[in-house]
Amino acid sequence: GIIEDLIQFGMEKLVLFGTCGVLDQDIEATSIIIPTSALRDEGTSYHYLPASDEVEVNKGIIPLFQSFLDSHKVSYQKGKVWTTDAPYRETIGKMKRRKESGAICVDMECSAVAALAAFRGFELCHFFYAADHLSEEKWDIRTLSSHSDLDSKDRIADLAIQFALFWEKAD
C-alpha cells in the first residue's frame, strides 16, 4: 500500500533494501545480495502480473548499481531470491526445491515489489543484506533481530542513500 501511495505522489524511482535469509552458509552476514529474479511464492504479485514461476528484478539497473558498488569497493553477489509471505512454511522440502531452482536467499516482498514496478512502470533498485541462514539442519539467526554488526548495517543504509542520489544524477 505504501508504494502505491508513493506512486500517486509522483515517485518514479525506488531504492529498496532490507534483510534476507541466505540459503548458502558461505554467504557471510551483512553481505550484499543483488536479486536478478524472484521465485514467486506469495500472493500479491499475482494481482499485478500474469501467473508465472518467476519475475525479473532490477530490470535495467543492475549494471549501474554494480558500477556504484565497485566504485565504493563494496563486494556483492547476484542471484535469484525466493519470495514467500509464509515464513513459518519455509520447510526443508521447499528450501531444497528453491535451492535446486537457483535461489541463494529468501525474503518476503521482492517478487511483489518487482511485479508492482513492472505493472506501474517505476524504476526499482532492490537489494538485500544477508541476515539469518537457513539450512537443512537448523536455523542460524546470525544478525537477524539483533544489535550486532551495527556499523555494517549503518554502512549499508548509507550506501542506499548515496546510490539514490547517484542514480538521480545519472539520468
Language model features: what each stretch is:
Residues 52-100:
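Active-site rim beta-loop-alpha module in soluble metabolic enzymes
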Residues 64-72, 116, 159-170:
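Generic non-transmembrane alpha-helical segments
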Residues 12-13, 104, 123:
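Short acidic/polar active-site loop segments enriched in Thr and Asp
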Residues 54, 58-62, 91, 106, ...:
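Generic structural signal for well-ordered, non-membrane alpha-helical segments
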Residues 111-148:
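Zn-dependent metallopeptidase/amidohydrolase metal-coordination segment
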Residues 134-171:
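His/Asp/Glu-rich mid-to-C-terminal helical/loop segments that flank catalytic regions of hydrolases
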